[in-house]
Amino acid sequence: MFNIIKNDKNSNARIGVLELPHGKVTTPCFMPVGTLGVMKALKHDVLEKLGCNLMLANTYHLYLRPGIDVIKEYGSLHNFTTWNKNFLTDSGGFQVFSLSNFRKIETEGVDFKSHIDGSRHYFTPESVFKMQEIFESDIIMALDICSSYGIDYSEASLYANITTSWARRTLRAYENRKEGYDGFLFLITQGNFFKDLRKRSTEAILELNSPGIAIGGISVGEPRDKYLEILEYNSSLIPKDKPKYVMGIGTPHYILDAIYYGIDIFDCVNPTRIARHGSLLTDNGILRIKRAGFNVDTSPIEQDCSCTLCTRYSRGYLRHLIKSGETLGVMLASEHNIHYMFRLIQKARNAIMNDDFTQFRKLYLSKYDEGNFNE
């Protein structure tokens, strides 16, 4: 399922290939988030043109709307959405546990209230796996508890223990999956920001020998130095032959940090979310196109970018579209930001191939951190 092609000699960065049911995926890999099986403001053919082979969709949101029975009628999430590349489906755990005032965690599962209409629902590890089996997801995520930064040790320990128990139950369901279904299960480590809990959780998850491992519960509001500390530590506990996934990181500096410590897959809504508000990713930082200084700027967002926006339209025109609320502006900005992330990942792969990733990261971060446009 996972083959390592090249290890960087001066860091833990590596290039690999995931062999998934709907095609090969080269890692490191940034997954765009298509919560409901589609990217906001980006058609499938645009994503394919950009080189996307793996998209994230969310079980919680698909369960609530359009509903599991609807997708079941189509035979799979791929058939329903017409996306013929790979899907990783998140378990929905993060969304459920974000509803802190509307859910109740039990050892059996979690009771929660829909954010749409207030109706009550109950998720178990088995039911969440079954939904993803109906989707025929290429990568399935187990239900887990994503705890917030700053909780006390006893609560973090309890949530890590429940996550491990749910992982065992998910694995049993996966081992009894329907005939012909060939998706891969990723189990999730937890433990908050306590190293002994991280170690205990990871060792227990590794005993289950799932095809892939995810590091959960980081990038949840903690300081960057704490993020780096736990990222490095938890990644070091996972054998190198396992594909490693950190959920919910999508800013360039966090992604380069993750690659440096041996992470293969990451996702985030950030690139398209900020695009909808007129923020564009560049090698020099965030370009905020709504600012008045771009009103008559005839240059592209980035000179060396080959996306539709940069090859055809000016900064001034994009500012006009975004300020006017035109859908085209959001579409162009979203395409640019996803294209930018894919280009950044390709540059990282090239640096790994040349055993130069450490220097690449250092130079990129020195420029990016200083480069927020202030016009």
Curated annotation (Swiss-Prot):
tRNA processing in keyword set: yes
GO annotation terms (biological process): queuosine biosynthetic process; tRNA wobble guanine modification; tRNA-guanine transglycosylation
Enzyme type, top EC level: transferase
GO molecular function: metal ion binding; tRNA-guanosine(34) queuine transglycosylase activity
Region (RNA binding), start-end ranges: 248-254, 272-276
Active site: D90 (proton acceptor), D267 (nucleophile)
This protein's UniProt keywords: Glycosyltransferase, Metal-binding, Queuosine biosynthesis, Transferase, tRNA processing, Zinc
InterPro entries given in the database record: ArchSynthase1/Queuine_TRR, TGT, TGT-like_sf, tRNA_ribo_trans-like
Domain of life according to the entry: Bacteria
Entry GO CC: cytosol
EC number: 2.4.2.29
Reaction it catalyzes: 7-aminomethyl-7-carbaguanine + guanosine(34) in tRNA = 7-aminomethyl-7-carbaguanosine(34) in tRNA + guanine
Positions annotated to bind substrate: D90, S91, G92, G93, F94, D144, Q190, G217
Needed cofactors: Zn(2+)
Keyword ATP-binding applies: no
Chain positions recorded as Zn(2+) binding sites: C305, C307, C310, H336
Cofactor: record remark: Binds 1 zinc ion per subunit.
Pathways involved: tRNA modification; tRNA-queuosine biosynthesis
Signal peptide region: none
Subunit structure, as described in the record: Homodimer. Within each dimer, one monomer is responsible for RNA recognition and catalysis, while the other monomer binds to the replacement base PreQ1.
Main function: Catalyzes the base-exchange of a guanine (G) residue with the queuine precursor 7-aminomethyl-7-deazaguanine (PreQ1) at position 34 (anticodon wobble position) in tRNAs with GU(N) anticodons (tRNA-Asp, -Asn, -His and -Tyr). Catalysis occurs through a double-displacement mechanism. The nucleophile active site attacks the C1' of nucleotide 34 to detach the guanine base from the RNA, forming a covalent enzyme-RNA intermediate. The proton acceptor active site deprotonates the incoming PreQ1, allowing a nucleophilic attack on the C1' of the ribose to form the product.
PANTHER family in the cross-refs: QUEUINE TRNA-RIBOSYLTRANSFERASE
Family stated for the protein in its record: Belongs to the queuine tRNA-ribosyltransferase family.
Protein name, UniProt field: Queuine tRNA-ribosyltransferase
